UniProtKB/Swiss-Prot annotation:
This is Mediator of RNA polymerase II transcription subunit 6. GO terms for biological process: regulation of transcription by RNA polymerase II. The gene is MED6. It comes from Cryptococcus neoformans var. neoformans serotype D (strain JEC21 / ATCC MYA-565) (Filobasidiella neoformans). Component of the Mediator complex. InterPro entries: Mediator_Med6, Mediator_Med6_sf. GO terms for molecular function: transcription coactivator activity. Belongs to the Mediator complex subunit 6 family. Residues 160-186 have a biased composition (Polar residues). Pfam families: Med6.
Amino acid sequence: MAQQVEEIEQDLSHIHWSWPEAIAANPARSLATPDLAMDYFAYSPFWDAKSNNNVLRTQRRIENPAYGHAEEKVELNAFMSGFEYVVAHSQPPDLFVIHRREVESSGKRDRVTGAWFILHEKIYQCPTLFDVMSTRLKNATSLISKTLSTLSENRPPANPRTTTLWRSIPSVTSNQPDGTQPSSLDQAEKPDEGKKDDSLNGSSPLDGSDGKASPAGPDWHLFHALQATRASLVSLETLAKTPTQTTDPREELNNIEIAMDNQFGGQNQSLSGKGPNVKGGAAAVKNISVPFVPKHSAGHATSTTGLTPSIWGGSASLGVSTAAVPAREAGGSPLKWPGGDKSAPIAGATLAGQTGR
């Protein structure tokens, strides 16, 4: 029982086997047919001596030493138990696929328990699905672990003035002893201090001692500018694909007029060249001639034909009634009327109404 368990646990997937002398000894000097490939496979360590193929070879070769797979594949159908080897696929002389399948008591041979392939005269064992998935997952886990370790070692410093940037800095090799050479991470943490010290010391790119050019540091301004440009490419492409909207100036002007009419209740001046709007109608004021009014004393009432003295005080306006506005002199003081010191109101006098007189 222990020997059977050891045979089951034997794994030969890590090796491949070949025997060029055996191929050179056959009449074709190559694996020209599937029968020759099966006979070549029988010499390998992957061959199981308990198979039905080996049972037939042991019995028949006593009478026929040249007995091979060409004869045994006909007699294998007589077995109702055990397992056997068959050539499942062949592309002579380079590729052959060999299956090991179980033989049931009913004669079915559907269950495949092993697979091997012969590629360029070398025999390999096909891995199982479990082995493939396990190897791939272990490989992926190892790569992820190495990546996280590398990122943790080269983590950028926390700087509230700028965003976090992961930089790829080449390793610096020097003949200085350990502890004197600054690490690449320290250089990445202080990219501006080196520039500031160089500007204060007045150093130049050329070393004065040997005349060699010192390596220039990275241009971080250019780096940030390129990053900003790359970030705005998406919005620029969207803006370029969006068609421009054409607006009609007349329609926009009409919309402004409607909005002003709704806001001021019809008392605002029209923008389309018409006169001031009043409740009684729109009057077009083209030319207004204001006669010269001499300066009078404050003790006399002054009135120009059809015009009130409030024009000189600045209280007259287009399209707005000047009722309850005190009359003033040219000097700006209220006019004295014979009836008293009260300022005389002007009831319903508008500039538009005086132009016809």
